[in-house]
Amino acid sequence: MKTLLLTLVVVTIVCLDLGYTLKCNKLIPIASKTCTAGKNLCYKMFMMSDLTIPVKRGCIDVCPKNSLLVKYVCCNTDRCN
């Protein structure tokens, strides 16, 4: 009985993925922040005039489309931006 109960608890925790949150870099990559619920992507924003230096980083729910002035790069793993 105890084994069955323990098995059910473990399966519940694995299925619900309790406590998992995405971590994304801030503008300075050394610092990261934990994303709020619903924001499941990390992003980097670049100005099209200089694609080597990101001007903004953080968490986002949907990856924005690029424009003539701004390029976005999105990813979905911890500190991938």
Swiss-Prot record:
Chief location bin: secreted
Source organism per UniProt: Naja atra (Chinese cobra)
Pfam families in the cross-refs: Toxin_cobra-type
Complex formation: Monomer in solution; Homodimer and oligomer in the presence of negatively charged lipids forming a pore with a size ranging between 20 and 30 Angstroms.
GO biological-process terms attached to the record: killing of cells of another organism
Keywords: Cardiotoxin, Cytolysis, Disulfide bond, Membrane, Secreted, Signal, Target cell membrane, Target membrane, Toxin
UniProt key word Signal: yes
Molecular function GO labels: toxin activity
InterPro entries from the UniProt entry: Cytotoxin_Cobra, Snake_3FTx, Snake_toxin-like_sf, Snake_toxin_con_site, Toxin_cobra-type
Name used for this protein in its record: Cytotoxin I-like T-15
Record family assignment: Belongs to the three-finger toxin family. Short-chain subfamily. Type IA cytotoxin sub-subfamily.
Protein role: Shows cytolytic activity on many different cells by forming pore in lipid membranes. In vivo, increases heart rate or kills the animal by cardiac arrest. In addition, it binds to heparin with high affinity, interacts with Kv channel-interacting protein 1 (KCNIP1) in a calcium-independent manner, and binds to integrin alpha-V/beta-3 (ITGAV/ITGB3) with moderate affinity.
Tissue expression remark: Expressed by the venom gland.
Keyword Secreted in record: yes
GO cellular component: extracellular region; membrane; other organism cell membrane
Subcellular location: Secreted; Target cell membrane
Disulfide bond sites: C24-C42, C35-C59, C63-C74, C75-C80
Signal peptide start and end residues: 1-21
